[in-house]
Amino acid sequence: MFYLFNGVKPVLGLFLFSLILTSQAANATEQSLKVVYPRTNHKTSADRIFFIGTAPSTGQVFINGKLIQRSSAGHFAPSLPLQIGENNFTFRYQNQELLIKVTRVGLQPEIPQGVAAFAPNSLTPAVDIARLPGETVCFSAVAPPSSNVSVKLGNQTVSLSPQPQTALLPDNKAALTGRNQPITASSSHTYSGCTTVGSNLSFKTPLYRNNISNTVTPDTPTLIDLGKPEFQLTLNGKTITTTGTGKITVLPTNQLQVAEVTSDAGVARTGPSTDFSRLTPLPKGTRVSITGRDGDWLRLDYGAWINGKETRIIPGAVAPSTIIRSVGYRNLPGKTEIVFPLQAPVPVSVVQGDKSLVLTLYNTTAQTDTFRTDDNPIISRLDWQQVNPNQVQYTFNLKKNQQWGYKLRYEGTSLILTMRHPPIKNGRKPLSGVKVLLDPGHGGAESGASGPEGTLEKDVNLVISRLIRDDLIKRGATVVMTRDSDVELSLVDRQKIIDNSEPTIALSIHHNSLPDNGDAENIKGFGTFWYNTQAHDLALFLHNYVVKKLNRPSYGVFWNNLALTRPASSPSVLLELGFMSNPNEIQLIVDPSDQKKMAQTITDGIVEWFNKTRKY
């Protein structure tokens, strides 16, 4: 369900909520000492943490006996260092006192001292893995210095050698605080070694006889099970042996299993966990050979990984491949569909450029002699090339810089690429013919960030979104709202609303906070986030426009893999209007007059951006 607005609708709750926020700010002097983040017993791996809270503006607030800085309204957000283990912080305001306990956990495994033992959870592979014959498999363990470490796998014994010190990379969120440089790690005493597996193994594929049809077909191919590795450690004359948790098998190259994508858009990644980057989603029905496994993750023959939960195995299927001969066009209202007739639904990828869209088909060989290329509203020319024996690349050269969204799907074995046309102005108002989706972030139990007085991000997001909606409607736009009340809505549901409603642009409205090691006292400003190339110009333009017109500090423009920036069906941008965590900026965020200025400026920026894109 979503909410569609194309005429002015009075919002009763907006005025009341603004009064509540005003009342909160006005009555700050009557409030007691409060710390809203972190809660006591918080655990973090950060080397420092900020504290968000407030107290009456008269008087002073101390943390562990040290006076801290506060805003004119009495809010504070100091950052303090953390030691490994338990850290206690005592907050004092006049005769009031709060104790907050924060535990810092280490990033590296704890090394046993002076005893023959492996560090807990340090043996790798930690999950069951499967590899092709002749591939390299590496083993590692953390053990005390001067240990003699080896691993036995089947009839092989592999020595594990101590490794030189390597730097640690911080979490991806460190890019949001500017503290993303490598961290010098203390010596972890990691022992590693590698070997090849299955080079001299032979595979037999058993046959299955169907008693009804009397036909004989290949059954499930036999895997070579090498079992779990045995790790051995010798120190000071004492030897221990520990069995690893991950079993190792070798896949049969004569009949690799074939997986079919069962989700609408299979999440392809660069490696076997959600820590790895996303690639172009695989359309439902895509078929691809499995060349490796890591736990629940499948390595696919074109190089990507996918969680097995998004696939099903097709028994007895041979490795999918196809030839391609022709390409067809279907011109529809507001969009063009390009049809690629294939023999099998193969993996694909898409890369957008400034005036191009490049589609790659894997496991595909061209037998193309001719295809039709009439004039098209958005495409100036289609080029193609066989970039390697199993990979065909199609380059759509476009007439204008701005792209308005695309979708991929399979109809049977034919791939359909849908490319959307630019909006057509159908009235006198500046945004006539434009549909804008507004997504007020969070909602329901998902409250988002919190201000020092307990103001919740979800509420402010909704207030601002309603104001933007009303301004957009006055300019002639049709507006879709993912929510218009305090309800919980999953990220997947929000994405589906974008894909189903096909807005001209989609904006997700948020207010910011920081990772634990951020400088909440000083970091503030307006920021925008984009993922697909088609959204970059909109993100950059709105950022620059709002920062200049409102004289707000710039937090920056970020490429970011966020659920509400990923939809490719429309240019999708996430806006962070300010920092709930900043003790000064929060006063602007909750001020009704500043809320109206922000909403109107964002709307003005949208109008100016459409004026600009229509010219080029």
Annotated model-derived regions:
Residues 280-286, 458-466, 470-474, 496, ...:
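Solvent-exposed, polar/charged alpha-helical surfaces in well-ordered, non-transmembrane soluble domains
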Residues 501, 505, 512-516, 527-530, ...:
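Active-site-adjacent mobile loop/cap segments within catalytic or ligand-binding domains
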Residues 2-15, 23-46, 58-60, 67-437, ...:
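Short linear recognition/processing motifs and adjacent strand/loop elements at protein termini
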Residues 244, 491-495, 559-561:
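Short beta-alpha junctions and helix-cap segments that line functional grooves
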Residues 418-505, 515-518, 522-524:
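Active-site histidine-acidic residue metal-binding/catalytic motifs
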Residues 45, 131-132, 272, 276, ...:
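Soluble non-cytosolic domains of exported or imported proteins
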